[in-house]
Each structure stands twice: as structure tokens, then as C-alpha cells.
Amino acid sequence: MENIFSKDSDIELVDIENSIKSSYLDYSMSVIIGRALPDARDGLKPVHRRILYAMQNDEAKSRTDFVKSARIVGAVIGRYHPHGDTAVYDALVRMAQDFSMRYPSITGQGNFGSIDGDSAAAMRYTEAKMSKLSHELLKDIDKDTVDFVPNYDGSESEPDVLPSRVPNLLLNGSSGIAVGMATNIPPHSLNELIDGLLYLLDNKDASLEEIMQFIKGPDFPTGGIIYGKKGIIEAYRTGRGRVKVRAKTHIEKKTNKDVIVIDELPYQTNKARLIEQIAELVKERQIEGISEVRDESNKEGIRVVIELKREAMSEIVLNNLFKSTTMESTFGVIMLAIHNKEPKIFSLLELLNLFLTHRKTVIIRRTIFELQKARARAHILEGLKIALDNIDEVIALIKNSSDNNTARDSLVAKFGLSELQANAILDMKLGRLTGLEREKIENELAELMKEIARLEEILKSETLLENLIRDELKEIRSKFDVPRITQIEDDYDDIDIEDLIPNENMVVTITHRGYIKRVPSKQYEKQKRGGKGKLAVTTYDDDFIESFFTANTHDTLMFVTDRGQLYWLKVYKIPEGSRTAKGKAVVNLINLQAEEKIMAIIPTTDFDESKSLCFFTKNGIVKRTNLSEYQNIRSVGVRAINLDENDELVTAIIVQRDEDEIFATGGEENLENQEIENLDDENLENEESVSTQGKMLFAVTKKGMCIKFPLAKVREIGRVSRGVTAIKFKEKNDELVGAVVIENDEQEILSISAKGIGKRTNAGEYRLQSRGGKGVICMKLTEKTKDLISVVIVDETMDLMALTSSGKMIRVDMQSIRKAGRNTSGVIVVNVENDEVVSIAKCPKEENDEDELSDENFGLDLQ
């Protein structure tokens, strides 16, 4: 037997320790680069990239019919991915799950698993096709935009990376465990990512704080609520962080007990396992107060119902559930990805800049490809044009040639053409010798020369290149405009979230059933007087909008209820929605008691002692209290006003105290006897206005009456007081419907009726009276006008926002409304047809408003 250790042996001796190290390192790099970690540019692991590319080549696209998943898996493992079919199918399934992917890359048909942990059906039963978004990952791949590499056996080629018009790594996130390292990148909102990228294009040196004005944080496909910004900021700054996510819940009231309903779960939480976990904790008496847990989820969404015992407090039970179950989880962020064949942890800004760099590279390569193609075509057309310009000579030359080669050589020699041009001339059909075909060739050549010039300019100009990226990003956003799902709330030990929230003007609406939302006021474009408006909210069949107002996101909202309680809430904590969104139940935002109803909502920026809060009730009562008495925030609220039986709040106004105003410190004065004037309306028709010093309160009634009296005649009283009479009604069925504060008699008061009839009137036309009088006519009411709805002070910097009973909002320039006298009706302000105006408010003007129509060009004058 030959000695294997002899010098003549072909066997090479190696050190086993070094061999193991080398082999393990090779294996590690293979797993890291070729399997477990995503590429930082397109956000895909090799298996995901190969699945999409195989579907693209196999024509299993979203514009075609579904194909069997087994066909896709077979194409992937046969052509690109030399691994087991199970691994490929599992990856395909996850790409189609809307609870795993924020924006699924594949549309599945059949059983693709569930949030309860159910497995997908076998690949022979399910079908799949590319989603519309995945086309954006592969667009322009046929234009030499990315490098191709040989597949595992060298028989075909596959893309090293996809062109990816979307920032897919941040969009859908990624998770994976490699050798000695792992990645866990959360998904994000497409709209926010694009807004951040557009800002970064305009501001190359933008800071993280600036970018986070647009990219608020992760947006998980299962929704939930993120508590705290510190973990998000740390993850975005360093690439590592921890994000606390809770289930989204609401409380429903039943007879003598509460019900906790889970609407959304933390990302990657198994719903069935969660229900089992809660049941086990109740059985072991680790959580008290729960009588039943059941799953009422359906195709509309998640609904896990937790019924409580009568004596149980929902807040305590809910806190225990968060503490003891997966209703609260922590998402550990590790933004690790492959770049230049090496793993690296990225910050948010680095990933955004890397995506923009990738897109620049793709667009440059695409432009070069299109330029070469255009130049090649122009070259051919130039040859054809030369031939057409010398058609008789060309025909004679070809006829006198013995063969094609001779003809080609003769054309090249005679006209200075290239071989390509000569071949194109020889291949040209006789039909192209017509005048029409000649014109087509000339037009095509002219267009090509313009296109060549455009493409050359792109390659020369960084600005044009970035403009192309901007246009593509805006196009993507318009195609896939999906609002954020996951809410982000402040944490008890968090930084001041207001530093990260822009102070924007919002329209806040609340419905009869207590659904509240905020919408940027810019979404309601100003319309011409008499316009029909835009739908402000979609309500349930038995619901309608009760009130709306405008406020800034940093303002504090004071909610006053029918029980006289006052609660607080920051505007930015109200979920932002679209114009037609239903909103969120207000009971999830403030601690209302059972059957308690909100009657007034007042926005304020501070609780200055120089300000007062004036309440007006339906029965004509006015009450004034120093605003500072409402600043001590408690979760159970504070007492705001005592109401008489059958009375309710109409409005509440914050008023700045007059500088020379002096208040009595003793008991309640009999202000009824401190009269200035108390003249009947009939005697005021020919009277001159009476001027006064200081602010005045102006209240109006449903039947068109009004009263103006000095603010100083309503002194400040305590929080729990009742108030005093503002106006006495002439008619039994009359009631107070609105009130404003007048600074001086030069101001204009805008009044509007239920049928959209309105006018502007100088405040001086309304005589000053004593508080508690019967008032004077504010608006002349008829069958065409119906009842008076309310009044506002005209402000040239503000627009009027009117709300109808069907939920439409219309924005009107107050200056476009005609001025009219006190005892008149006015003109059509809002065209309500069979609808009615139910509320009005003021909001800031927008710069790009439409021009208003003049009174001479529009409408009905009801003077």
C-alpha cells in the first residue's frame, strides 16, 4: 500500500485548525452575503430577489392571471436558487402575507396562512402573481440599469440587485439571522419615506430631527401603538434601538360592566396564542376581573373581546394585560444590511442617502442605455434620409450592382454611409419611398434629436438628475397613497414630542356618536361663494357631525361635557385622518364616564390669568371664569359649570381681559339693574349706534335675535358657579345658538342661516344693551332662510368654513360676502340645496385659493 505521507504522494497535508477556520469563514460569508441579510439598495435577500425575477421572466405578473405557486417555486430553484423548495415557498408565502409585509410584493390566492399562526396550504393548491408595487422594484431592469451575474451553474444570469424605485429596505423592513450577526429592520409608511426623501433631495445636510418631521417612526402592517420616541430616535441615529409596541384597544360599555376590545396587535404577535395566554393567566388567577375572552375577528379586521366582571376597572385590567401578555412587545431594531459585499449597520440618514445614490446610478445607466439606443436609431434614420434625398441615384446604383455586397460598398463609397446605414437602405421597402413615409422619417429623426439632447443634458446636469428622482418619487406616492396604520404616542419618560411635531393648522371634527379626527385645513380648498363643498367625514348610518373647529397641533383642547366636567387633550394626540375618514372614538382619548356627552370643545395655547373662559348655554345663560382655574390637569377632569335642568352648553369662548377692567371681590352683584340701554327693537330702527370702551359680548338666538353688552358686566366667578342671564327670549321656542367677542364697533359680524343665507354687518349697527335684555333683530328670517345658525367675527386673514348636515364642508372667503344692514337677510353664501348648514367656524386663508365671484355675477339677493 502506498504511503500517503511520502514525498511522492499527491495528497496535500494541511493544518486541521486552519482548515476549519477557513471553511467556517467561507460558510459564514456565504450565509451572510448569499442568504440571510438584505442588500441595502433594494432591501431584498437573494431568495426574494430571485423569486421576483423568476416571476418577471415567467410572466406571472399582476396584469396576467394567477399561476400556481409550484410553478414559480420550480422556476426559482431550477434556474437561480439551488436550495430546497420548502425554503423558497416559505419566502414566497411571507411576501404575500399582509400581516407580515407592510406592502406585500406578491398577491396570493388561496390559503397563505393567518395571523393565528396557521400554515399556508401546499404550493400545489395556492396561486400567486406579482403585486403592483413589485413592478416598481423591477422597472427598467431591461435597460442595463443593474449588473447581472451568472447563476449557480453558469447557464443563465440573474440581477445582482434590482433597480427598485421605492426604498424597499425601509418600506417593508427585513429580519434574518446570519452567523454571528442578525438584522431586524422595521417597516415604514411609504408616504412618509417619500416625503423624507424629497426633503433630503432639497436639503443635502438635513439633520435627523428634520427628517423625523416626515418619517415619524415604524409603521407595522398589524397597526398597534408605539409608545415613546427615544427608542426610535436611537435606532435612527445609531442603527440600534428598542421600540415598545402595544395592542390598540377600546372600551365598550355594557350594562353595569366594561368590555375591552382589541382592534390591532403588535407586529409578529400570534393572535391565537395571545388568547390562550390570557385564558391561562385568568385560570391561574394571575389576572383578576376577566369573565370571558372570545375571538370575533373576521375579514373586516381583528376583534378580540375581553369581557370584564361588574366590579372590575377596565384601566387596571388593561394595564395588567399589557404587563403580562404579548399585548405589549418590544421590537429590537438592528438596521444591518449588505453594502459593497460587506455587512454594515446603517443609520436612517445613511439608508436614505444610499437609496438616492442607487437611484442616481440606475437613472444614469438607464439614460446611457436610452441614449445609445436613440443614437443608433438616429444613425439609421440619417442614412435613410440621405437615400431619400438622392433616391434616383441610389436606385440606379443598386440596379447596376451585381449583388448586395457590391451595392453596399457602392453606397458607402458614394454617399459616405456606414455599413449599418447601407444595410438599412438595402432592407428598405419600396413603400417607404412615398412622400408620407419620407415625412415620417424626417419627423422621427427630429424627435430623436430632441430626445438625444434631453438625455445628454441629464448626464451633464445633477439638477436634472435629481428632478427625475423627484418626479418618480411623487409618481409612486400618488399610485400607492396609503395612510399610516401604527400610531405613535408619547411615553411617560419620553422627550417632548412637540419638538418633533410641526405646528400646523387642523380642522377637528367630532360626531354625535363621539368619533373625533383632525385633518389639515389645507385639504379643504376655498371655493366660490355658493359652492357645494367637499365631504368632510364619512359617518355611520345613525351618526352625524355635531361640531367642528380649527386649531393648531400644539394647542390644548378643553372638552366640556353635559355634566359640567372639563377634560384636556393635545390636538396632535387626535389621530390625523383623510377628509372622509370616520375618526377615532373620543372615549379612547379622554376618560369620559358612562353616558357622558361632550357639549363644547375649546382650543387654547395657554392658561394665562389675563384670560377668561366664557360659557353660553341654550337657555341664554352666560358664565365667566378665569382660565387659570382650568389648568390643573387630572385624568378625571375638573368641574367647569353647573347647568340648570334641561339646559346645555352651546359654546365657550376664551376672552382676553380688558386692561382697565376691575372685578369686585365680594358676592354676586345684581347686574340686572346696571342697565346701559334696554330699548325695544322697534324703537331702535332710526337710532344711532352707541359706542363703548372695552370688549363686548354678542349672543344670537335661533329666531334671529341678538344682544350686545359689555364684557365687564359679566364678572369672573368660580368654576362650579351657574352664571347669569345673557338674553331673555321673546318666543318660547327660541334658544341661544352662538356668541362672539367684539373688540370694537368697527368690526364686522358675519351671520348665516340654515339654508346658507348670510351677510356681513358692522358691529356698530347693533345697539349696546344691558345684559339680560330681549335684544334686537340680528337677521331677518323667512321661509327661504330658515333659522339662524350662528355668527363669527369677520377677519380678512381668515376664511369661513361651513358644515352641512350631510357632512359636507365648504370654505368661503368672508370678504366676498356682501355687507348688509342689521334687519336684512343677506345673500346665498353656501348652496345647500336640500341640505342645511349646521355649524360654521373660521380657518386661516390658503395662498392658492380660487378667485371668488362678485355679487353682481352670482346668486340671489334676499334683502
UniProtKB/Swiss-Prot annotation:
InterPro entries: GyrA (IPR005743), GyrA/parC_rep (IPR006691), Gyrase/topoIV_suA_C (IPR035516), Topo_IIA-like_dom_sf (IPR013760), Topo_IIA_A/C_ab (IPR013758), Topo_IIA_A_a_sf (IPR013757), Topo_IIA_dom_A (IPR002205), Type_II_DNA_Topoisomerases (IPR050220). Changing residue 90 to N: In strain: UA580R3; confers resistance to nalidixic acid and ciprofloxacin. Residues 37-500 form the Topo IIA-type catalytic domain. The keyword Magnesium does not apply. It catalyses: ATP-dependent breakage, passage and rejoining of double-stranded DNA. The keyword Nucleotide-binding applies. This is DNA gyrase subunit A. The lineage of its organism: Bacteria, Pseudomonadati, Campylobacterota, Epsilonproteobacteria, Campylobacterales. The gene is gyrA.
